[in-house]
Amino acid sequence: MIKLDFEKMGGLIPAVIQDHESGEVLMVAFMDEKTLNLTLETGKTWFFSRTRNKYWMKGEESGNTQEVKEVLTDCDADTVVIKVKQNGPAACHTGNRSCFYVKWENGEWVEHSNPLFDPNEVYKK
């Protein structure tokens, strides 16, 4: 039986979140054993925030949740790919569909931002 290697990166593994239909990479976040288990049990994506030092469910504030369709691991068992149905217009906290909207072009990083919601309205604190 395969056991995921959470020790290699100090208890965390990268989680690549991908649209289950298009294959588009929506985001990359980190999981520990607890958040992976929560994800598998609830069918919603859960992560560990390194900056806020807390657990969080994708969409808990914005409503843009992710419904898990498939979970895969790589040959080293130290990374997961989670294929999801994105509920709501955007996976990124900036309001963009994907967190990967900055592209290397002609020797510089160019932002191709197309926010689908205003993060200042959604994440009022």
Curated annotation (Swiss-Prot):
User: Which UniProt keywords are given for this protein, alphabetically ordered?
Assistant: Amino-acid biosynthesis, Cytoplasm, Histidine biosynthesis, Hydrolase, Magnesium, Metal-binding, Zinc
Enzyme Commission number: 3.5.4.19
**GO BP terms in the entry:** L-histidine biosynthetic process
At which positions is Zn(2+) bound? C75, C92, C99
From the Swiss-Prot or TrEMBL record, state where the protein is found. Cytoplasm
Q: What does this protein do?
A: Catalyzes the hydrolysis of the adenine ring of phosphoribosyl-AMP.
Family of the protein in this entry: Belongs to the PRA-CH family.
For this protein, the record's PANTHER family field holds:
HISTIDINE BIOSYNTHESIS BIFUNCTIONAL PROTEIN, HISTIDINE BIOSYNTHESIS BIFUNCTIONAL PROTEIN HIS7
Protein name per Swiss-Prot or TrEMBL: Phosphoribosyl-AMP cyclohydrolase
The species this protein belongs to is Geotalea uraniireducens (strain Rf4)
Gene giving rise to this polypeptide: hisI
